Amino acid sequence: MASELAMSSSDLPTSPLAMEYVNDFDLMKFEVKKEPVEPDRSISQCSRLIAGGSLSSTPMSTPCSSVPPSPSFSAPSPGSGSEQKAHLEDFYWMTGYQQQLNPEALGFSPEDAVEALISSSHQLQSFDGYARGQQFGSAAGAGGAMAGEEMGSAAAVVSAVIAAAAAQNGAPHHHHHHHHHHPAGHHHHHAAPGAQSNGASAGHPGHMHLDERFSDEQLVNMSVRELNRQLRGVSKEEVIRLKQKRRTLKNRGYAQSCRYKRVQQRHVLEGEKTQLMQQVDHLKQEISRLVRERDAYKEKYEKLISSGFRENGSSSDNNPSSPEFFM
């Protein structure tokens, strides 16, 4: 079939009308007769592809069935344009092999292609060498510019897939380094509580020193200005703690003072109450005494009146000047 497609330079149309006629002609009406594939070359090709693992697991497309028949490398007939025929055969081979390089034609994702390429690195190396050889061979001829472009795009696809596979292979190493760094981080985290405990234990002597430096009485009696002057150079936490302690002590002193004042006032009031009750009792006694005196004086008065009336009645006849005489 490749030999039938290979045309000599004299058979190629040159006029625009002929080219337009060829373009308008429907070539799909004709059946293309396929030549039988050489058994030894197809078997070697299949064995080479299967050795590294199948590129696709779908039953609709297999490496052996999708590989086009290899070109015939028979000796060119004299006078038929051997150089251009070789270029046309190479172009036909590369356009057919493009199905293997296109992942969409095979029906799998780029991730599947990367996994397949990782599992078959040897196959990729051999195919890369073969593609480069075909690219150099097609670029050597004068009429192989189109084949060189197709092969260049194929080589670009292969190199891109190889780079993706290398990047994916390098990813586990990166994670491995992260796993190596994690234990160190854990050690740091485990060491941090110890450092905090050491800092806390180191802070306790500071607490004891400040507590010994300022007694409760000094904190209560010391003014705020003097306390701030004494606490220069001390950490903020210690200053807050001491001021809170001073406030607590002063509040406690205020509460005790108020309680004492209330007790004292209660005692005073109770004493005054007792004194007043004593005065009331004394006044009651005075009242009773005065009542007795009054009664005595009244009785005496009544006696005097009665005795005086009798005396006046006996002497009224002899005394005409008395009031009863004129009546």
Curated annotation (Swiss-Prot):
Q: Name one GO cellular component term.
A: nucleus
The biological process GO terms on file are:
regulation of transcription by RNA polymerase II
What GO molecular-function term can you cite, just one? DNA-binding transcription factor activity, RNA polymerase II-specific
Pfam families referenced in this protein's UniProt entry, alphabetically: bZIP_Maf (PF03131), Maf_N (PF08383)
Q: Where in the cell is it found?
A: Nucleus
Please provide the record's keywords in A-Z order. Answer: Activator, DNA-binding, Nucleus, Repressor, Transcription, Transcription regulation
List, as start-end ranges, the regions of compositional bias called Basic residues.
172-191
Which cysteines are cross-linked by disulfides? none
CDD domains listed in its UniProt record: bZIP_Maf_large
Record field: transmembrane: none
Q: Residue ranges of the bZIP domain?
A: 241-304
Write out the similarity annotation.
Answer: Belongs to the bZIP family. Maf subfamily.
Q: How does it assemble?
A: Homodimer or heterodimer. Binds DNA as a homodimer or a heterodimer.
The protein, known as: Transcription factor Maf
The gene that this protein is the product of is maf
